[in-house]
Amino acid sequence: MGAAFKWGAAARKTVFPLFYFLIFFAFGALFPLLSVYLQEEARLSGAAIGWIMSLPPIVTMAAQPLWGTAADYTRKPVGLLLAALVLAALFGVMYALAGSYRLFVVLTVLLSAMQSAIVPLSDSLALRHVHEQGGNYGAIRLWGSLGFAMAVLAVGWLSDHIAFAVIFYAFSLALLTAAALATRLPRYPMGAPGALTRQDVRGLLASRPFRLLLVATFLLFGPILANNSYFGLLIHELGGTLTGIGLAFLFAAGSEAPFMKAADRLIGRFGMVRLLLLAALISAARWLAYAADPPLWFVYMTTVVQGCSVGLAIPTALQYARRLAPERVQSTAVALYSAVGNGLGAWFCTLVGGYLLERWQIGAVYLFFSICTIVGVLVLLLLAKRERTAGEEK
């Protein structure tokens, strides 16, 4: 028992934080600069970039529920995570060699199918670890924000001074290192394989609070994740350099860390829905400011508010989705939550953003983001009202 506790403490202090740092370092190395790469190096049109950047959310929407169901069915989430990491790294290297629009499309689909498993499986493992050993999920997840922030700065500088293709090699190297570390992630006893039934999944989807959370996730996280595709173009259009893009992402992602660490304490004090409302209102204000064609210095200054919006929204929404689900379908619930926000919402916002960018300017993209987020605030208000009603009935 003592040995198990020591291993749990060691995993919480070193293995999980380093693992999150590596996987988000990989994402930060590739995705913020990918749209700029497709524009500057591949010479693709705005509509073509919009289509390619909308593919990962489409694939995520289809693949993530399958990964989550597979994890609940096989009871082997670490093995599935390891396979996804290695294959995503392989497709990342192949992406660097692509030279045509069709090849970009094929590799984007393959890469996205593997990459879509990484975060929900990692989150399920981390949440299970915190449940078993104690601790703070936000304190683990903040290392992902730090990894993302360091990657966009370091890889942005390297792509400016060496070669743009370095974004793909940095992505793959970080994922392979994370795969090696994944073999040390703790494995906890789980139910027998095959215990998950269709009735379990139907019961989850029949929950109205869970459905409302999915709608709010679509409207809140769709713009947040689509921003990763268009934020570099916004700064580039305002006169920023690749290193400047890296600095902006550094400020934005780095500001998330303290809020993620404080998320559990704030949840206990204010409640999950109130924190999500605060995050949504801050995001809406930020998108409206970007739609107004602000000066570059203003964009750099306002990136730090991402900590109060995204830094609170990610751990709060994830834990809320898990709380609403029965234990036997929690991996599926996390995967569905991720598929709707990271998949459907991001796809919709990225695709519409591409057409708005082609027809008008980047400001129209951020005006659309603000409208989506404001509608998301209304859904969260409905969810808050339902929670109050349920509390009064009890």
UniProtKB/Swiss-Prot annotation:
Q: Which organism is it from?
A: Geobacillus stearothermophilus (Bacillus stearothermophilus)
- Tell me which InterPro entries the record gives: MFS_assoc_dom, MFS_dom, MFS_trans_sf
Instruction: Identify the SUPFAM superfamilies for this entry.
Output: MFS general substrate transporter (SSF103473)
The record's subcellular locations are: Cell membrane
Chain's role: High affinity transport of maltose.
An example GO CC term for this entry is:
plasma membrane
Sequence similarity: Belongs to the major facilitator superfamily.
Segments forming a coiled coil: none
Membrane side Extracellular: which residues?
39-45, 105-108, 161-163, 234-237, 293-295, 359-361
What kind of membrane protein is this, topologically? Multi-pass membrane protein
The protein, known as? Maltose permease
> Which Pfam families does the record match to this protein?
MFS_1_like
- Determine if Nucleotidyltransferase is one of this entry's keywords: no
Cytoplasmic membrane side: 1-11, 75-78, 127-137, 184-213, 263-272, 319-330, 383-394
Alphabetical UniProt keywords: Cell membrane, Membrane, Symport, Transmembrane, Transmembrane helix, Transport
> Molecular function terms in GO for this entry?
cytidine transmembrane transporter activity; symporter activity; uridine transmembrane transporter activity
The residues that cross the membrane are 12-38, 46-74, 79-104, 109-126, 138-160, 164-183, 214-233, 238-262, 273-292, 296-318, 331-358, 362-382
